Each structure stands twice: as C-alpha cells, then as structure tokens.
Amino acid sequence: MAIHVKNNIHWVGQRDWEVRDFHGTEYKTLQGSSYNSYLIREEKTVLIDTVDHKFSRDFVQNLMAEVDLNTIDYIVINHAEEDHAGALSELMARIPNTPIYCTHNAIDSITGHHHHPEWHFHTVKTGDTLDIGNGKQLIFIETPMLHWPDSMMTYMTEDAVLFSNDAFGQHYCDEHLFNDEVDQTELFEQCQRYFANILTPFSRLVTAKIHEVLGFNLPLSMVATSHGVVWRDDPAQIIHLYLKWADSYQEDRITLFYDTMSNNTRMMADAIAQGINDVDPGVAVKIYNVARHDKNEILTQVFRSKGVLVGSSTMNNVMMPKVAAMLEEITGLRFQNKKASAFGSYGWNGGAVDRIQTRLMDAGFETTLALKTKWRPDGSALEICREHGREIARQWALHPLDDTPARRVISPVKQTTVAPQSASAPAESACGCSEVAAPQSTAQPAAQSGNGCMQCSVCQWIYDPALGEPMQDVTPGTMWSDVPDSFLCPECGLGKDVFNPIR
C-alpha cells in the first residue's frame, strides 16, 4: 500500500517485520526494518530505489497497482546494495528500456548483481540535475563510502525533500512512516545503533559530506531515508546528531565486556565495576558477556563510552574466540577518542591479556592498566580488582573527583607479581591468586614516523613521499604539501582531505 509523503511523492516500499539479520549475520535487526522506495509523479514519473530482492515480486505487483509501469520515465538508484536495488531485475523485465540514473561505481555494482550490462545507465555526479517538470528538478550528490563507493543522495527542489540513502536511517519497522508518529526512545536508540555499527568508520566523511550538502544552502522540509522513518518533524535534528556522533563522540560511560570459562573473569569484571562506582558514582557502567549478549548492542555501548575494559580467560595462551571476534569488529569500526584496558584470569600463562592489550592499541585506543588474576580470585584478589577499577575511574574521569578513597588499599598501578612462577609449574601467589600486569604504554604504535608519510583515514593506505605515486604523476620525493589537490587515494578513491599525518 502506498503512503503519501508530500505533494506528488508516495512511499511504495516494503516493511520487513521478521528480518533479524543484516549484512549476513553481522547486524542484528531486533526491531525489523523497512526498504523505502519512493514514487514521484510530476510531469515526469520517477522511481527512487526499489526494495530487498526477497520482496521483488510483491514490490512489482504493488507498484503495478499504483502506476502503469510503462509511464515510469526514470529510475534513480541511490545505492546498488541488494536491500536497495534488489528488485531491479523483476522490474526491468517489464520495462527494460527505462533509463537508470546512478553513479559510475553503481553501474559496476548493479551489473555485478543483476548481470544486465545492456540496461540504459546514465552516470551522474555531484551537482548534476534532472528536470522532472512542474518547475522541479532532482539534484544528485555523490556520497562515496557512506557506506559504499557507489552511494549518492538525491534532492528534490521545490518540495525540498532529501532522499538520503542509508544516511540518517535506521533498521526500524513500524506501521507509521514519519518520525513524529513513532516511539521516540526506540527511534533514537535505533538511529544511534545504526550509526555506531555501520557508519562510524566513515565519521570524517560523514562530517565532510554533511557540510558539503549544507553548503548548497538548500531548504529542507523532509529527509526520506532508505530504511526506517521519514524525518518530517524537524528533519535537521538527525543531521545535527550525525555531526555530533561523527565528532569523536563519547559520554561519561564505561563499558566492560568479556568471555569466561569458569566465571573467574566474570568475577573480575564485577569487582572492577564496583571499584569504578566507588570513586565515580556518576559514571554509567555496563557489563556484557560477549557469548550471551547482542554483539551490536555491545558495539553501540562502546561507541557511547569514554573507555572500554575487555576481559578474557586465557585458553591455549590466547584470548577466547568471541572476544577476538569482537576486537576484530572494533578495529574495523575505528572508534575515536576512547581509552581501553585489558583484564583476565589464567591458570599457568596469561597470554590473553597481553594479546587483548596489543589489539586495543592497534585499534587506536589509548591503553592503560592491564590486569591479570591467577586461578579463581579470592577476597584479596577481588579487592585488587576493585582498586583497579578505582584507578581506572580516576584516570578516565571527565570531571574532578573526590580524592578521598572509600577504602585504603594498595593501588594496582604499583602492584607487581606477588609470587613468581616456576619455569616448570605455575606457582600460586601469596594472596591466593592475583597478579597485576605492568601498566602499558599509552602511545599507539605507528608504522612509520618522522618521514612525512600520510595515511588514509578510510582504507589506511599510506602515502610515502620517498615513493610518490607514479600512477598519478607524483614523483618520488614529493612532499604531501606539494601533492596536487586532485590526488585520490589509490585504494578507496577519496581525496586529500581524508589523509592524516603518521606521527
């Protein structure tokens, strides 16, 4: 059933109440989702995007009930992923000569998915327009890597509607279409979850692209997303939230997550959290077992936090697999402006904590205060864990704290191994079980330093002045300041503004 959006614009998309996995099984869509397609009927009839491929037949049948397919003059594909363009094959089988407007990269993606290079593609770039009659135009805005290289937005003049693609959306299903009609708590939780899990790696691009769009000084009455609600009540609010979230976002919050074999690491997590609360009762603290909790919720909490503590029992001298997988996710999301610490229990060798600490450093976190406990923590060891939490609270505080401790105990920063391990057999410490690792360096290791190298913040490709970039006529010995402004990253195709110096 079509839903009226504004004037001659109607929603002709598909709700998906049952979907629980997205991007394979990487994103849990616990609130379902929607695939938003829009039909514009001015002097020219335009279809913007389709729906997920599994709804192809339903989509085309519903569209035929709304409009004669042969009257569709143009199809605009903002993004070629299958949840946006999945019904193209079913639709184009009926109207094969209808022109498709998309970016150059989208042609490759669409052809790769649907295998119809004969379709009539029209490549568009930022600033290109399409006259649709009645004094109205569509303006196209390329948004590469938000979140695919082929992505773009489409703006409709006069009606002042921005068809924003994945940006500003959320995997959220509701019978109501507009943001002012749905549960606001649910809505904004899903917006933040979406940003944290999908768009965080591209935060710098989000900021740059939003400012580029705002620089056009176009009026805005609605933001029509590809998933979730249409923003009609104060549509600028979600844009301002994106700018906030993209700017090294953090709250006064600490997240702990762990996996454990015998509950020993869980006991450590509980005690550390108690210690944090002793010193800073105002900070929000959440604890998650990665084997039992929703992964995307944990990642959202890490995104919100000023710091994260990651724990694991040692198994085969490495961390437990679910913790390793979570750290791989975190590395890819490239969170900014966050501190981190590793902790964990072990029996004869505590290799997991060392590996976690290294992975956190590699992921760009400022690391401090790793903590190891041997065997099952007793009362003395748990008190060391609490003091570890107190020291974390002091070091990570965003505001002045009361310097008077709740209880006077030995600081874990000064603690060393109580009883050394024998080379032949594990020795138990004097307190029964605990050891505190030496504080780790807070400096992130750099691949190169002091040589003028620049690293792409999106794909991590490194420009080395000693090598230059011959494919773009940048000769060896060319310093970054002398590289032409037209330079593009050879890996992701983005410009100089996404590069940062390697220090």
Curated annotation (Swiss-Prot):
What are the TM regions of this chain, as residue ranges? Answer: none
Binding of Fe cation 2, residues: 83, 166, 227
Question: Which pathway does this chain act in?
Answer: Nitrogen metabolism; nitric oxide reduction
Report the residue ranges that make up the Rubredoxin-like domain in this protein.
451-502
The GO terms this record gives for MF are:
electron transfer activity; FMN binding; iron ion binding; nitric oxide reductase activity
The record's subcellular location field reads:
Cytoplasm
Cofactor comment:
Binds 3 Fe cations per monomer.
Q: GO CC terms for this protein?
A: cytoplasm
Record key words, sorted: Cytoplasm, Electron transport, Flavoprotein, FMN, Iron, Metal-binding, Oxidoreductase, Transport
Coiled-coil intervals? none
Give the matching Pfam families: Flavodoxin_1 (PF00258), ODP (PF19583), Rubredoxin (PF00301)
Q: Which positions are annotated as binding Fe cation 1?
A: 79, 81, 147, 166
* InterPro entries associated with the record: Anaer_NO_rdtase_flvorubredoxin, Flavodoxin/NO_synth, Flavoprotein-like_sf, Metallo-B-lactamas, ODP_dom, RibonucZ/Hydroxyglut_hydro, Rubredoxin-like_dom, Rubredoxin_dom
Positions of the UniProt region annotated as Zinc metallo-hydrolase: 30-210
Could you say which residues bind FMN here? 260-264, 342-369
Where Fe cation 3 is bound, by residue? 456, 459, 489, 492
Which cofactor is essential here? Fe cation; FMN
Give the family, as the similarity comment puts it.
In the N-terminal section; belongs to the zinc metallo-hydrolase group 3 family.
Role description: Anaerobic nitric oxide reductase; uses NADH to detoxify nitric oxide (NO), protecting several 4Fe-4S NO-sensitive enzymes. Has at least 2 reductase partners, only one of which (NorW, flavorubredoxin reductase) has been identified. NO probably binds to the di-iron center; electrons enter from the NorW at rubredoxin and are transferred sequentially to the FMN center and the di-iron center. Also able to function as an aerobic oxygen reductase.
How it assembles, according to the record, is:
Homotetramer.
Please give the name of this protein.
Answer: Anaerobic nitric oxide reductase flavorubredoxin
Query: Which species is listed as the source?
Result: Pectobacterium carotovorum subsp. carotovorum (strain PC1)
Which gene specifies this protein's sequence?
Answer: norV
